[in-house]
Amino acid sequence: MPLLYKAFHGGSPVLFLAISFILGIAASSAIGHFVSQLWVEIPLFLFIVFLLWLLLRRKGASVSMLPVALVSMLFVLLGFIAYALHASAPDVAWPKSKKLWCGNIVSVSETKATKRCVVALVAYKEGDRLVRVRQQVTLSILKGSEASARFRPGDALLFYARIDHPRPYVLPNGFDYAKWLKRNGIAGTCFVANRWMRLSAESSEKLLQRQSLLMRCRLRSLQLREKLLEQYGRLPADSAGRQVLAALTLGDKSGMTPSIRELYARTGTSHVLALSGLHLGMLISLLMLLMRPLLCFKRLRLPVFLSAVALIWCFAFLTGLSISLLRSAVMYTLWCLFMCRGRHGRSLNNLALAAILLLIVHPDTLFDVGFQLSFLSVLAILSGMPMLNALFPSVRKGRIVIDFLFISVVAQLATAPLVAYYFNSYSVYFILGNCIAIPCTCLLLTFSMLFLMCSGLPFVQELVGRVLACVLDVLHVGLSAVARLPFSSLWVSPSWQSVCVCYVVLVLLYVLLRRKCESMLWARVPCY
């Protein structure tokens, strides 16, 4: 309890609340099917609080710890109820027979035999009337002469099929495909061979207007991304380089080949392909650098930071609203709002608040691999930076190198157990890989923006394109050299119990190192 009290009254109280909320969601997921009624949960909560009060009173604990315990239990209960309500929501009642459906394409991926489209439905035909429906489904279309044409986001489809709920399909590592579809807002699956038709551009636009406001914004942003991706076709680079650039800058990984994914996985640099705080932070830093003269005027601070918030969310929509990018978008939004008032805010509190907001909207997000890896890595970095400052308080030369190595090692250690559990691999030379990938990513993000902005200047765009192609070649050659090193990737298959033990050990090591750093700080205080 003293640790809880110190955490709550310390500098990161929101982190304490977020952990309590997460524990409630995890408990609800584990035992929610046994306890799923509010009339059971609330008395259970009151009973636990009563036992906690007796325990504190018996041990002679401070009275000020009781509110901390009550707040903790309250957020555990809120997390428990949030997940229970989410899990008990009824599934969509799909018609039992085939119907004529219409909707807009959201995204497209390909397999050897089919094209798999995520379709945002608008309506289906029931007799002589149209029944409105706003759900997303995966539509698998058998490849043929008509399906060979390229689908684009926003295109309207008319198809005759029966939609079913996703079938449970669990991989050996515990990945549940049906739950993954549900977490991504997909409520059904269907297959058509030839009974489908793509509507005209005019019909697609009319159908798009019948979508919800959020879906319209998403489809508009994806259409804009498609136009930007077409400009990458002018690059003097091979298809693999263009695929990497599309993933690094616009979050489009639909064209990524298994060999490219394997290369980045073996070198421990897969995180640069998933848009996150690294990419968004570079864009915000560049924007702040350009807007720095305006920040000298107090009246312009609010418009500048509000413009930054608008840019953050435009970029998030443009790149597909991935979990890791949503986390960083919320954190940078909070940072901008604090800066409007002349305050910096605490990064750990911003991280925790971002987690709470995302989990309130969708509690099942807690079990998403991207959510877990993103939050764990950032939590480890933010928790470890004070220790680095304590160990090297006055080092200025080479500080960037020290910070870079520290962040790479800490993020890799924090996510290694989960990466090994989900992907059964561990990259040995991740530091070498990141030393190549991150500087190249900075250059690619900067020059890709110049490339896209110079679309009206063909000569300038060609010069920038050559620079991009050169950086892509350096990135590919460097990572390929790291991947060819002996034992570059180890195959591991830990159990979930082993993963829990690893994190217990990591937490204990963190506590010991933090106490050591605190003692070093006290030792530096002069005595008079």
Regions found by a protein language model. Give the residues of each.
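Membrane-interface helix/helix-cap signal primarily in integral membrane proteins
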Residues: P2-A7, S64, M73-H271
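Helix-loop-helix transmembrane hairpins and adjacent membrane-interface loops
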Residues: P2-K96
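C-terminal regulatory/interaction regions
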Residues: P2-P13, L17, F21, I31, ...
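Small-residue packing motifs within transmembrane alpha-helices
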Residues: F16, S20, V68, F75-L78, ...
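Hydrophobic alpha-helical transmembrane segments in multi-pass membrane proteins
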Residues: G24, C190, D252, T257-F430, ...
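Membrane-helix interface and helix-disruption motif detector
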Residues: S29-V40, A61-V63, V369, S427, ...
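Alpha-helical transmembrane segments of polytopic membrane proteins
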Residues: Q37-F47, L373-S374, N434-P439, S498-C500
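Alpha-helical transmembrane segments of multi-pass integral membrane proteins
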Residues: L379-S488
